[in-house]
Design a protein with these regions (language model features):
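Sec-dependent N-terminal signal peptides of Gram-negative exported proteins
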Residues: 1-16
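Subset of outer-membrane beta-barrel
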Residues: 17-249
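Short active-site oxyanion
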Residues: 36, 40, 57, 207, ...
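Extended hydrophobic-aromatic, low-complexity segments
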Residues: 191, 207-210, 219-222, 231-232, ...
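Amphipathic alpha-helical substructures
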Residues: 446-466, 472, 687-717
């Protein structure tokens, strides 16, 4: 009986062959029905399941004769990327061999997908009667409990066709227990096939399978996971319960649980972060190794939840991040530390902003040749009025609101009272934030911190050590030994590349929060690219369950600002929209924020600046000094207003004249009307009266800390807080963040847009 059963799965005589490998033989390498697994032999059995592939996956599988381990008559090789898979199965018999190849594609998401595969054969195709064919597949996973799938395999002539269906249930909505069944029927009349069984995952990386077949045989299988690798085996038993043969498989790819960690807990690990270079919101698809804020936040959160991670070691040498991003990372690290995990930070040369970030460490290491500068904060500008007067360029500032100061550097030779007042308030808030958090984390009295800033300012290494600003003087290459001293136990340092995200094995399309970035000046086709941004917001609103708009913009033109604000308002009527303000979200940057269901800002964010301003530069002798003259004809009383000398080599176009009194009155009317409209829209978006907004407008900028107090911002926090608020408003769980990959086409669009 044992030998007879093995022959059933060996290659039968040529007259029993089909033009493609039947479903029953394809499933021989699977521990379960196609739908009971995550990816269905990486698209070979059902190409639609390529939707579940998250990275490079490779597998080698083979069957053995009784009493043997080496491949016997059948083996397969499978490889896949997201939405793309290739596989082959080689079969041998009667001294001959053939190979069947399949290249598959998929579309859709994790809830519903379709796929198409093209198949062809090589080797002794005539003897085995193999032919080219195609396979259509689909699956439906409406929830984490249910999976249904179907495939149709056919020759291109449609002379031979086979349909297969599978159904799987996870009663606990997780991979811990799965029941499955499948059925295949050759439409051309071959014998039907069915099977049923279950998968029991005992611990991460250890799973048992059992499967009953229509011919009254059974298989028992084991999956032993090693993280990025799996060892799989199943043994087939005949109707009498005797061992018949076995199949084996080796998988290399995504993280799927490590049985060794279950049996033998690994050494405590420290995540090693090298923050050299710029930290950005986004990076280019190619040739850009920048780290992004959302990736770092997600990485730290994963490490916080991982019981094997005991701490983080950070090399902050050469770190470049704006103060708001640095604060967000600092807050995330503070949460990490609150879970009883250690943070070790290495610095070499830092100013007060860099030291503010680094002071979150439990143990702060300064390079023996390094330096700390606690110089405080300063804001100042260069004023060009005197130079413009000498050059013969006139400039008139159309300023009707006390704090709207964008153009004053051209119209004045010193800071206005309004500018001085608002900048001083910004610096005071920034300093108080740094003093409070540094003093708390370094166990200093605020008065002592003030003394260090005002009386010493710049600290050499031993001075910093004696002042309690750092805990040790050492180089980065000594950090491993330092951690060993701190932990008094063996540990392992791992890099982010050695700490990949585990594969998401949950069925069904997860609800999504889209992050849309509004970065740069408010302009139509540069800066934040308003034309494209409006479409991005609409697309995100259609496809996601909630939208987070990340704003980092100093403002700019009214038109693009208003277009984006209207897009946010429209989306808000359909889905929750939460605004996360970065370092600057002022003027037009605040306008595009105002319609959010909630606005989140960091305490050191610069926001507000609700106002409108303009200015006018004109010839006041420069043209004559350099020997130029202009002439013109016109129709229309004011047609000559923008006309003047042009210097194309330096891109200068300077109008010949200033505005007349009537023209100035008209311009003032326009600016005041735009301002009134701005104030009214902010009042509507923030659900406040016009008088309430007028009292805090006039073009004044505020820190995020003050903006919460006056009602321009709802909550202090960063991007992660905004995401969690969006999840709450959409009714989604807030405990898991998974960064959605950017499509290749979108990455190409970003690169091309940056080059044009």
């Amino acid at each position: 009986m044992l030998k007879a059963l093995y022959c059933v799965f060996a290659i039968a005589p040529a007259d029993a062959q089909t033009s493609f490998i039947p479903y029953a033989e394809r499933s021989e390498f699977s521990l379960a029905a196609v739908g009971g697994l995550d990816t269905g032999l990486y698209g070979y059995a059902n190409p639609a399941l390529l939707n579940y592939v998250e990275g490079m996956e490779n597998a080698f599988a083979w069957s053995t004769a009784p009493g043997r381990f080496a491949p016997s008559n059948q083996w397969g090789l499978f490889t896949a990327l997201p939405h793309l898979g290739f596989g082959m199965i080689r079969q041998e018999g009667h001294g001959r061999a053939t190979s069947e190849y399949r290249l598959g594609f998929s579309r859709g998401d994790r809830g519903f997908g379709i796929g198409l595969a093209a198949g062809w054969a090589g080797g002794e195709t005539r003897f085995f009667e193999r032919d080219s064919h195609f396979a259509l597949g689909g699956f439906w996973r409406p929830s984490p409990r249910l999976s249904a799938g179907a495939t149709l395999t056919s020759t291109f002539s449609l002379s031979e066709r086979e349909g297969a269906f599978d159904l799987a249930l996870r009663p606990f909505s997780s991979e811990h227990l799965t029941f499955f069944g499948d059925y295949a029927s050759a439409i051309t009349g071959a014998k039907d096939f069915w099977s049923a069984g279950a998968i029991l995952e005992l611990r991460p990386g250890i799973a048992l399978t059992g499967r009953y077949f229509d011919n009254r045989t059974i298989s028992l299988g084991l999956r032993f996971g090693l993280g990025a690798a799996d060892l799989q085996t199943q043994s087939r038993f005949d109707q009498d319960g005797e061992y018949a043969f076995a199949t084996y498989a080796i998988r290399l790819g995504s993280q799927q649980g490590n049985a060794l960690h279950t049996l033998f807990p690994p050494q405590p690990r420290y995540l090693q972060l090298d923050l050299l270079g710029s930290i950005r919101h986004r990076r280019y698809a190619f040739f850009d190794k920048s780290q992004t804020l959302v990736e770092l936040l997600t990485l730290i959160e994963r490490a916080r939840r991982d019981p094997a991670i005991k701490g983080i070691a950070i090399n902050a040498s050469g770190m470049r991040a704006n103060p708001e991003m640095a604060w967000e990372l600092r807050e995330k690290l503070r949460q990490f530390r609150a879970y009883g995990k250690r943070i070790v930070v290495y610095i070499d040369r830092v100013d007060i902003s860099g030291y503010h970030f680094a002071s979150v460490a439990d143990y702060l290491v300064l390079d023996p040749a390094g330096m700390i500068g606690l110089q405080g904060y300063l804001a100042g500008q260069t004023y060009f009025k005197g130079a413009l007067d000498k050059l013969g360029i006139g400039f008139e500032e159309w300023r009707f609101f006390k704090y709207k100061s964008m153009a004053e550097t051209y119209a004045r030779d010193a800071m206005s009272d309004g500018e001085r007042e608002q900048l001083q308030a910004l610096l005071d808030d920034w300093y108080n934030l740094a003093r409070e958090e540094i003093s708390k984390d370094r166990s200093l009295q605020p008065a002592v911190f003030d003394h260090l800033v005002d009386d010493t300012t710049v600290f050499l290494p031993h001075e910093a050590l004696n002042a309690g600003l750092v805990d040790r003087l050492a180089r980065w290459h000594e950090i491993d030994a330092i951690i060993e001293e701190l932990e008094v136990a063996p540990h392992t340092l791992i890099s982010p590349t050695s700490y990949p995200r585990p594969m998401n094995r949950r069925w069904g399309a997860r609800k999504k929060v889209a992050i849309v970035y509004a970065l740069g000046v408010c302009a139509m086709d540069t800066g934040l690219h308003a034309r494209t941004l409006v479409d991005d917001i609409a697309e995100a609103c259609d496809e996601a369950d909630a939208v987070v708009l990340r704003v980092d913009s100093p403002g700019g033109d009214v038109l693009p600002s208003d277009l984006v604000a209207a897009a946010v308002q429209k989306c808000r009527g359909q889905k929750p929209v939460v605004v996360s303000q970065g370092f600057v979200a002022a003027s037009g940057g605040y306008m595009i924020s105002m319609y959010g269901d909630a606005i989140v800002a960091a305490p050191n964010t610069i926001t507000g600046s609700i106002g409108v301003i303009a200015g006018w530069a004109y010839n006041k002798g420069l043209k004559e000094k350099i020997g130029l003259s202009t002439d013109h004809v016109q129709v229309g009383r004011h047609a000559d207003l923008p006309f003047g000398m042009a210097l194309p080599l330096i891109g200068l176009n300077l109008p010949d004249r200033n505005l007349s009194n009537d023209e100035k009155k008209r311009m003032e009317h326009i600016i005041r009307a735009l301002y009134a409209d701005f104030v009214a829209k902010v009042a509507s978006g923030r659900d406040k009266s016009i008088d309430e907004i007028e009292a805090i407008a006039q073009g004044r900028v505020w820190t995020g800390q003050r903006a919460v107090e006056i009602g321009l911002v709802d909550r202090l926090g960063g991007l992660e807080i905004a995401i969690n608020i969006a999840k709450e408003k959409a009714g989604l769980p807030v405990d898991v963040n998974r960064a959605a990959p950017i499509s290749l086409m979108r990455q190409v669009q970003i690169v091309v847009g940056a080059l044009v």
